[in-house]
Amino acid sequence: MAARLYCQLDSSRNVLCLRPVGAESCGRPLSGPVGTLSSPSPSAVPTDHGAHLSLRGLPVCAFSSAGPCALRFTSARCMETTVNAHQILPKVLYKRTLGLPAMSTTDLEAYFKDCVFKDWEELGEEIRLKIFVLGGCRHKLVCAPFSCNFFTSA
């Protein structure tokens, strides 16, 4: 299961705001610290947190005060670039979902930092709204007991 999200950098508050694709524009954005790219521990994420928001398909960590599992976010545009031409990232995320050894956390952090922030910080793009894919998060099973294809819209 994966969820498609709008991702908007709010530089004034230094947060990354997330909202499900198709949500009303006046909906409450989800946010997490921009600088925190490590996954919160499962114990730091209460299982009932955010249940009242009814955003089906989003993992419980999306509502955590510690922020979402930022390591699981990547630009949908980057999914088929030369960086990921041989489908390494989906395999790595899937292995991590299963608890198998995969790419090191340091390498993943560097990859995601590049994907998420390169266009905004280095290329100076005016449009700061991107579509991102959330996949492989270990918290996803809390909100989505049903099975569906990896990297598809929720």
UniProtKB/Swiss-Prot annotation:
GO terms for cellular component: host cell mitochondrion; host cell nucleus
Organism superkingdom: Viruses
Annotated localization: Host cytoplasm; Host nucleus; Host mitochondrion
GO biological process: DNA-templated transcription; symbiont-mediated activation of host NF-kappaB cascade; symbiont-mediated arrest of host cell cycle during G2/M transition; viral genome replication
Paired cysteines (S-S): none
InterPro entries: Transactivation_prot_X (IPR000236)
Keywords: Activation of host NF-kappa-B by virus, Activator, Apoptosis, Host cytoplasm, Host G2/M cell cycle arrest by virus, Host mitochondrion, Host nucleus, Host-virus interaction, Modulation of host cell cycle by virus, Transcription, Transcription regulation
Region (Mitochondrial targeting sequence) location: 68-117
Post-translational modification as stated in the protein's UniProt record: A fraction may be phosphorylated in insect cells and HepG2 cells, a human hepatoblastoma cell line. Phosphorylated in vitro by host protein kinase C or mitogen-activated protein kinase. N-acetylated in insect cells.
Summary of subunit composition and partner proteins: May form homodimer. May interact with host CEBPA, CFLAR, CREB1, DDB1, E4F1, HBXIP, HSPD1/HSP60, NFKBIA, POLR2E and SMAD4. Interacts with host SMC5-SMC6 complex and induces its degradation. Interacts with host TRPC4AP; leading to prevent ubiquitination of TRPC4AP. Interacts with host PLSCR1; this interaction promotes ubiquitination and degradation of HBx and impairs HBx-mediated cell proliferation.
Function of the protein: Multifunctional protein that plays a role in silencing host antiviral defenses and promoting viral transcription. Does not seem to be essential for HBV infection. May be directly involved in development of cirrhosis and liver cancer (hepatocellular carcinoma). Most of cytosolic activities involve modulation of cytosolic calcium. The effect on apoptosis is controversial depending on the cell types in which the studies have been conducted. May induce apoptosis by localizing in mitochondria and causing loss of mitochondrial membrane potential.
Family: Belongs to the orthohepadnavirus protein X family.
Protein name: Protein X
